[in-house]
């Protein structure tokens, strides 16, 4: 399945963050030829799909000489240009898990150019709320700030059963920035990328929270 085939209205409604990541991959011509599995297995630290799928704990079905197995998307890239597939294995399908009712996601990135560029930093968020808009789950995955996707730890303990507020966002931003292990290159310094990761994490959270909140209000009507 090519990336363009993945970009359909049902996905945008169910997992808008994943759809956003798909839509940012290359031009229309590239999207018509590249595959989602290929983007994962290419194992670029700057891949758009990796954080967007990892934050929702998506899985892959892998076929090989020893039969069928499953693994988390986040376990496939093991370093720049390296993946965990064994000889003769390939990805058969990608599984997006069923989501709680008041859940949503988002994906944002920073690029030096506005069009057709790879991410210098990216952030994905998955959030679940209850009817009172208290946070029940909040996951953040960062891209292009380490050899592989960074699934940030220590956030759920901080936010559980709380309303989203500026203080929480600031604390999460600091955690995200300190979780980075980026390189210096022409697209950004270590300090810049670490700072931007915290900023993008806040933006991703606000967007995902708004989408989940909209579901609560829509159902209430």
PLM regions: where:
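C-terminal structural segment of proteins
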Residues: 1-221
């Amino acid at each position: 399945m090519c990336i363009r085939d993945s970009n359909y209205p049902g996905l945008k409604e169910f997992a808008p963050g994943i759809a956003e990541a798909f839509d940012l991959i290359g031009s229309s011509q590239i999207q018509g030829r590249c595959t989602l599995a290929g983007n994962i297995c290419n194992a670029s630290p700057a891949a758009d799909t990796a954080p967007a799928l990892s934050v929702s704990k998506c899985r892959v079905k892998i076929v090989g000489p020893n039969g069928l197995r499953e693994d988390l998307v986040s376990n496939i890239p093991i370093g720049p240009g390296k993946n965990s597939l064994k000889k003769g294995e390939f990805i058969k399908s990608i599984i997006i898990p069923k989501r709680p009712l008041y859940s949503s996601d988002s994906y944002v990135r920073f690029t030096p150019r506005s069009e057709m560029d790879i991410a210098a930093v990216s952030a994905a968020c998955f959030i679940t709320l209850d009817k009172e808009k208290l946070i029940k789950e909040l996951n953040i995955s960062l891209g292009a700030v380490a050899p592989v996707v960074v699934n940030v730890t220590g956030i759920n303990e901080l936010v559980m059963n709380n309303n989203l507020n500026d203080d929480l966002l600031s604390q999460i931003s600091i955690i995200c920035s300190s979780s980075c292990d980026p390189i210096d290159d022409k697209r950004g310094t270590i300090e810049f990328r670490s700072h931007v990761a915290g900023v993008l994490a806040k933006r991703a959270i606000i967007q995902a929270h708004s989408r989940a909140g909209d579901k609560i209000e829509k159902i209430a009507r």
